[in-house]
Amino acid sequence: MDRREFLNRTTTASFALGFSSELSANPLSDGGGQGHVGDSSPKPTLSGTAPLTVQGDMAEQMVDGIHHLLLRRTKEAAGERPLLWNRNYGSVELYSLSVSPNRERFRQIVGAVDPRLPASSPELVGSVATPPLVSTGDGYKVFTVRWSVLGAVIADFGGLDAEGLLLQPDTTPVARVVAVPDADWTPEMLVGLAPGVPTVSQFARRYAENGCQVLVPLIVNRDDTFSGIPGIGFTNEPHREWLYRMSFEVGRHVIGYEIQKILAAVDWFTAENAKARVPIGVVGYGEGGLLALYCAALDARIDATVVSGHFQEREAVWKEPIYRDVWGLAREFGDAELASLILPRALVVEASRGPEVNGPPHAREEHRGGACPNGKLATPPLDSVRREVERARPFFAGLKLEHKLRLVESDAGEGPCGSEGALREHFGLLGLNAPLRPAGIPPVDARQYFDPNSRLQRQFSQMVGFTQALIRKSPQRRKEFWAKANSARPVASEFTEPPWQSCSSQWSTSPENWRQATKSHRDYIWEEVFGRLPSPSLPANPRTRLIYDQPKYHGYEVMLDVWPDVFAYGILLVPKNIKEGERRPAVVCQHGLEGRPQDVADASVDSHFYHRFAVRLAEEGFVTYAPQNPYIGDEYFRIIQRMAHPLKLSLFSFILGQHEQTLKWLGKQPFVDASRIGLYGLSYGGVTAVRVPPLLDGYALSICSANYNEWVWKTTSVESPRSYLLGSEYEMCDFDFANTVNYAELSNLIAPRPFMVERGIYDGVESDEWVNYEYGKVRWFYSYMGIPDRTEIEFFDGEHEIHGVKTFEFLRRHLNWGKPDKS
C-alpha cells in the first residue's frame, strides 16, 4: 500500500476542511464550551493550566496561523534585507568587494555552482537534411549551433551543452549579445524564422541587423511532453517543474543550469574579445528576463542588460510557478537588490506585457495530475515595476551612477517587448551611438525537416541526466560534509582491542564526543536545509480540556502558544494509576499525512493504519501525547512550503518549533520524566521521527514507522514507480538535502540515543531492499559506536501501518518501563 492509498482509506482524509479561500483567517474563537467528559469526577483541566475554551477545527486554525505568520514575514522581508548587506560606496572597487558575499550566496541558491568548461567556439549543428546555415538575413547569417557548458560529473553520464542559434553579422561585430527568449518561445520565434512572436518583439534579429553578434539559447519550455518516466507514467508537471524538483534536492536549479548556458556564451564572447574588444550585453523577456537579470547580477563581464516583462516587486514569488522557487530569495534578494549587484554596470528595465501562465498543463489520461497547482504569471503591474525601480535607484545613486539604471515603459507597461525605446537605451549604454536601423524583413528558414521538439528533448534529457549524475555523486558529497565529524571517531590504528569494545569505551561512556563533533553539522542542517526560526518566542500559556475519561486513563486536549499566530495542539493521555511523585516515561505519538491526534488517541477510532497506538501505550502505563502536525489540508498546507521557501524556511521550521515547545512543557509535568520522552511516528509522522530528534535533544529515542527509506532516491528517481517526482507531494523538496544528509545521516545524529525502524513488507512507500540499504548504514554506525543494542529494525507481515510489537518492546526497554500494565 502506498501513501496515496493510505490517504484514500484513512478516516480523516475525506473530511471537508472548509478552509477559506482567503489566506487570512479569523482569530481563534473563544466559545467557552467543554469537550466530552466521561464523568464528573476527573478534573476538567490539568493542574497548572488554564481552561481551553477554543472551539472549531484546531488543525485548520493551526494552518491558518502559520499562513498569517508567513504573510507577515513576507511583508516585512524587504525592510529587513539591509541587515544582510554591508554596501560600501567609497569606490567602485570597495562596493564590488562589499557585495561579493551576497553575490556568492545568490550563486549558491540558484544552483549556478558547477565549474564551466573552458571557453570554446560554438560548433555548427546540422545534417544533410538540415544544414547548419539556416538563413540569410539583412546583414547577417543564421546558424544552428551548440556550445559546451559543463563537464561530466561521473563517467557514465554526460555533461551539459547549450543549443540555439547564432546570428553572425557580415561585418565585424559592434557588440556581442545573448538574446534570451521566454520559455515558451523557441530561438526561431525570437529571430522571426517561425511564427509565434510579433514582428516588433523579434529583438534577436534587431541586434543582428544593427551589427551585433547574437547567440539565442534554447530555454526549456512549460509543456509537459517529456515529464515522466517512460514505461511507468507521465505527469502534467511542466518540464521546468520536473527539472526543478530533482535538481533542488542536490542544490541545483533549472534556473541555474540555464544561467550556466548563458554565461558559457559570455565565456566565448570574452575569448573573442581578446582579438578585438567590443561590449557584451544580455537581453531577455519573460523567463528570459529573469535569466538576464540573474546572469547580470552574477557576472561582471556583462556591460549592459535589458530585463523585459519580468522586473517587479518579488515578495509574492510564492504565487509564481514553482520552478521559480529559490531558497531564501525574498529574504535577501528582491529585484532591486539584484539590480544592485549589477553595479557599476548598466541595466534597462522594460515594462512590457509579460507572459500569461494560468497554471500547469491540464491533467489528462496520458499525463496524470501531480504538478504544483498554484503558481501563475501575469504582466508585471506598472506601479509595481516603478516601485521596484525606485527602490533600486538609491543603490545606483550611492556610486553616482544614476544614469546606468533606465526604465522604459512599453505602452504604459502593456505593450510588446523589444520596443524601440528599450533597444535605443541598451545600445546607448553599450556605447553604440549610431542610430538604430529600421527593422528588416524576417528571415526565412531554409530547413525543410527541422523538428524543434527533438532539440528540446535533447536539452531536457541532458539536464535530467546531469542532475541524476549529481544524485549518484551525492553520497561522496555527504561524505565530504561529514568528514570533520567522522574524524572524531577512533581509527583502526588506535584500537587496542576489538573495534566494538574500543568504540564502546570512547562513545557510550562519553556521548558528548559525538554530540560536540556534530554540533556545527546539526546547526547547518537546521539553518540551511530545513530553515530555522528563532526558538518559541511566547510563553507556552498552556490551556487544557478534559475530553476522555477511560477506565485506565484521562485524556486532555492541550494548546500551547509558540509564536504569534502559531500554536501547538494535541491530546495528552494520562494513566490513572500514577502515584503521587511518580514520573512516568512519555511517548509522543505522531500521526501521518492528513491525520489528526484523534486518529491515534481516541479509543473509538479504529484506524487500519494507527491501530490506536497512543491508547494502547497509555493502557500499558505510558503517558502519551499525540500532537497535531500542520501537514493537513492538502494544497492549503502545501502552500506553506511555497510561502516559506523564499524566506529560507520550510514546513519543518514550524514543526520543529512546535515540538520544541511541546517537549519543554511536557517535561515539566509532575507525572512525566523529562529524560524518558520518546517519539514514535507513522508515515509523515515517520518523517518527523527522522528529522526532529536529531535537532531536539529532548527526545530520548525515536521510532520511524512506515516511512524509512533512501530519501534522496525516493524524491529524485527517474526509474522507480514510487518516485515522488510522479506525485503531487511537491513540498518534499529540500534545498541541497542530498549533498548534506540522507536518512542514515539523520538517524546517526540521534545516536547515542536509541533509534528503531518499523517496516511492513507490503508497504508501498518503498521496497524492502531500499529500506535495508539505508538502514544498514545506521546499524553499522551504532555497532561502530559500540552500542548495537540501541538500534533495530522490525519487518512484519503488514502494510502501511503501526504494528506495535517489537516497537512496544523497544519503548519498554529503552524508556525503562515494565511489562504491560494489567491493572
Task: Kindly label every feature range from the protein language model.
Residues 5-27:
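N-terminal export signals
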Residues 30-154, 251-254, 300, 314-324, ...:
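Alpha/beta-hydrolase-fold serine-hydrolase catalytic core, especially in secreted/extracellular enzymes
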Residues 87, 185, 217-260, 283-290, ...:
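Aromatic-lined carbohydrate-binding surfaces of glycoside hydrolases
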Residues 130-190, 547-601:
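Glycine-rich active-site/cofactor-binding loop and its immediate structural neighborhood
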Residues 138-147, 157-158, 169, 203-209, ...:
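Catalytic cores of nucleotide-enabled group-transfer and carboxylate-activating enzymes in metabolic
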Residues 174-264, 311-323, 579-668, 714-717:
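Cap/lid segment of the alpha/beta-hydrolase catalytic domain
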Residues 184-188, 222-226, 288-292, 312-317, ...:
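Flexible loop/turn segments at secondary-structure boundaries
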Residues 267-338, 664-720, 725-728, 735:
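Primarily recognizes the serine-hydrolase "nucleophile elbow" in alpha/beta-hydrolase
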